[in-house]
């Protein structure tokens, strides 16, 4: 019931949950929008420690296919955004503005790459873009790198 209300809402609220409940609810909401591979999670401890992570689990079957030399199209966006979140927080804590700016530019490079039509297979399957291309994990990361380097 709550999931339906959250999905249909326009936002503007805070949904406080205990750790396990938040994990389950966030996964269900993310799945309703298409892909867990786009969702990150931030855990904050009472003593001020932070952990940034991709909310999805491991992709063991993709890894085994990769080891066999087969084409894989694993979406790294949540992992990249977990790193950028951690980099930004480190920059804030240590007052390193350049690190915060780099994190933002890397995130924008990811978004721009997808908006340009270059994406992994999971996004390709849901995208309504006309000029889109499904690429391997390595090709996607290379495209992000090229976009980032052009904007540094």
For each predicted feature, which ranges?
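Glycine-rich phosphate/nucleotide-binding loop
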Residues: 6-105, 112-113
């Amino acid at each position: 019931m709550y999931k339906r209300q959250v999905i249909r809402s326009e936002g503007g609220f805070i949904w406080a949950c205990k750790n396990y409940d938040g994990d389950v609810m966030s996964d269900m909401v993310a799945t309703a929008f298409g892909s867990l591979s786009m969702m990150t999670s931030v855990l904050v401890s009472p003593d001020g420690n932070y952990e940034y992570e991709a909310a999805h689990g491991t992709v063991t079957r993709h890894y085994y296919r990769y080891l066999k030399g087969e084409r894989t199209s694993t979406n790294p966006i949540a992992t990249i955004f977990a790193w950028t979140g951690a980099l930004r927080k480190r920059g804030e804590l240590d007052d390193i503005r350049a690190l915060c700016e780099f994190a933002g530019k890397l995130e924008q490079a990811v978004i721009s790459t997808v908006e340009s039509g270059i994406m992994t297979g999971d996004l390709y399957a849901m995208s309504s873009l006309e000029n889109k291309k499904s690429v391997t994990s390595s090709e996607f990361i290379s495209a992000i790198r090229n976009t980032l380097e052009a904007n540094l």
